[in-house]
Design a protein with these regions (language model features):
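Single-pass transmembrane signal-anchor helices and their membrane-water interface zones
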Residues: 1-23
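Polar, acidic low-complexity tracts enriched in Ser/Thr/Gln/Glu with frequent Gly/Pro and Thr-Pro motifs
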Residues: 16-195
Length: 195
């Protein structure tokens, strides 16, 4: 009986370790998706945060891949390449939930996107992004949504969810041309900062 309990405990514990996210990669351009990463650097979830995001998430075959392979597939997808070719803005936020891998993930994502003129990568703590999902927003869109509200905008979460990052940045620029997130300058992920 003890042996069976021990095996159950080990199996249950292993399951929890494997399927508990320690970092989230939030990719916003419209579509908006979030990729959950476990402590073993494996993709354990892919979720869309708007209609386009749900369609895009469903089209990806990255579940249980290493995050490097998953990021490569996402960034090389026709969906993302088409958006970037239309001069859309790509925001990639790496959210650390538990652990220390987010800096490595952020560095990898930054290297992958450094050739794109309209890409911005940054780190967020889970505390900074705790309210995003309750509003139905991905972490990346929530970050700019908060800035819009601090500048006096009355945009709703639903409106923000369906807008492209380029549209949200333009709205922020119109309200506050000095805002880092709204700058009309192109961002490069080589100069990311973990907040």
């Amino acid at each position: 009986a003890f042996a069976m309990c021990f095996i159950f405990f080990i199996a249950f514990g292993g399951y929890n370790i494997y399927f508990t996210p320690t970092s989230i990669i939030s990719i916003d351009i419209n579509p908006s998706i979030e990729i959950g990463i476990n402590r073993l650097n494996k993709v354990i979830s892919v979720e869309g945060y708007n209609e386009d995001g749900v369609d895009f998430a469903n089209s990806l075959d990255i579940l249980y891949d290493d995050y490097e392979d998953a990021i490569d597939e996402v960034l090389q997808s026709d969906t993302i390449r088409t958006c970037l070719a239309k001069d859309e803005f790509l925001s990639v936020a790496v959210v650390e939930i538990d652990g220390t891998q987010s800096e490595d993930i952020l560095q990898y994502v930054s290297n992958c996107t450094s050739g794109h003129k309209n890409a911005y990568c940054y780190g967020l703590s889970s505390d900074d992004a705790s309210s995003a999902h309750s509003l139905g927003l991905s972490y990346g869109k929530y970050n700019i949504y908060q800035e819009l509200h601090s500048c006096g905008s009355h945009i709703t979460p639903e409106e923000a969810s369906e807008m492209t990052m380029k549209e949200l940045r333009q709205m922020l620029y119109d309200l506050d041309p000095e805002s880092e997130n709204a700058s009309s300058q192109n961002y490069s992920c080589d100069n990311y900062s973990s907040e």
